[in-house]
């Protein structure tokens, strides 16, 4: 009796389709789906804590563009040799649909933008950050599928049964086009599917955050701190498996160093933040104001 096993994981034959003259890019679609999922989860979680759903929509208008800009800036800065060399086209730095969004920059600039908005509006950031965290890392997991379609950010060559086959892709002119082209069926490498490793890790962290939030009644931003610690722990391992070129500092990939720093900072922040959860009135200060106005109106009518 013979037993047959799956012979490697195939890459998609292409990552771009055309609807007439309009290109439909899988990478962009994965980002959009991830954003929608994160928005849906944040709405449910924030309103369950007593937050105003309008706050989520207002924050989305700020954090989404800020996150995309921050993510692209981080990528371009840390991989500047891909865009600013003698044979490079600097305008490629603007082509985000071709891949290249650094999560560190996205979270950092997005967080700063939301913090400024909440400070102006007088809304506490902690409850919102805790509501965002599980949906954010699930969105990151969905976004990793975009790397699969783009055949990018994979690991070193391997012979494990779950290796990812990278295809030779060409455009309509027959020229090599690894992102926008279509597969010829020729496998040029079998590699560690690091996109899948990170995807699965992110889903596991999402489940853990949902459980920990409920089991330990976490609040005041502690869920978000756990998100940062959990994500960076996995990213540290996966980053060391990747084979793509990266900026090195002291011989280490820049994202490895950033992962270590963020992990340590997240643990310190988690320990220093208050225990327990905020009351609905603390989550949405407008509640207490409205309640006070209602009492004052009722007293004046007596």
Swiss-Prot record:
Pfam families: LGT. The keyword Lipid metabolism does not apply. PANTHER family: PHOSPHATIDYLGLYCEROL--PROLIPOPROTEIN DIACYLGLYCERYL TRANSFERASE (PTHR30589:SF0), PROLIPOPROTEIN DIACYLGLYCERYL TRANSFERASE (PTHR30589). The chain crosses the membrane at residues 19-39, 50-70, 98-118, 191-211, 249-269. PROSITE patterns: LGT. It comes from the Bacteria. This is Phosphatidylglycerol--prolipoprotein diacylglyceryl transferase. It is found in: Cell membrane. Residues 279-302 are annotated as: Disordered. Catalyzes the transfer of the diacylglyceryl group from phosphatidylglycerol to the sulfhydryl group of the N-terminal cysteine of a prolipoprotein, the first step in the formation of mature lipoproteins. Its main location: membrane. GO terms for biological process: lipoprotein biosynthetic process.
